[in-house]
Structure formats: C-alpha cells, structure tokens
C-alpha cells in the first residue's frame, strides 16, 4: 500500500487549525483588527519588516533613520496589549512548527547520522 504524504499533510493542516495555538492567534489577531490603533501599529510594523527584508535580499544597506523608525515602532508595539498577545501566540505556534519540523525531518536525519 502506497503512502500518500499529501493526505497526511492535509490532516496535519486540519489538526493545526483545530489546535489551541492556532485559535489563540486567530482570536488575538481579531482583537488587533478590532482596535484601530493596534491595527495601524501592526500594519506599519509589518510594512517596515517587509521593506527591510526586501532591502536585505537585494543587498541594500538599511539607512540609520529606517532602523530608528523600526526601533520606535517596536517599542510602541511592546506597549500595545493586543499586539503583545498576538506576538506571544505567534511564538507558541512557532514552537509547535519547530517541533513538527523536527519530527518530519527525523527520517532524513537518521539516514545522514551514520
């Protein structure tokens, strides 16, 4: 009997959607979207992050004033309870992804371990 890995991947997707970690992110993000100030801060910070990533990928230097702006945004975000809750939930989900990834790559790790 052939194993269809995609079926298992789809089951994993559903399990992730049913997880407490996913639900916490979904609920926290809803709070961010409902609060105008939180949403604005969140959107600005995401835009700044994407701009940084794009510049890094293109090998461009990030100007000092952009770094300062990002630092100010990060400080404002830390003070926002809604965004802090979202970031904490994202960290927990990230930990789940790391653990799942370790499980997924275990067969390959075992091959190369010898």
UniProtKB/Swiss-Prot annotation:
Pfam families: Com_YlbF. InterPro entries: Com_YlbF, YheA/YmcA-like_dom_sf. NCBIfam families: PRK13676.1-5. Belongs to the UPF0342 family. This is UPF0342 protein SE_1526.
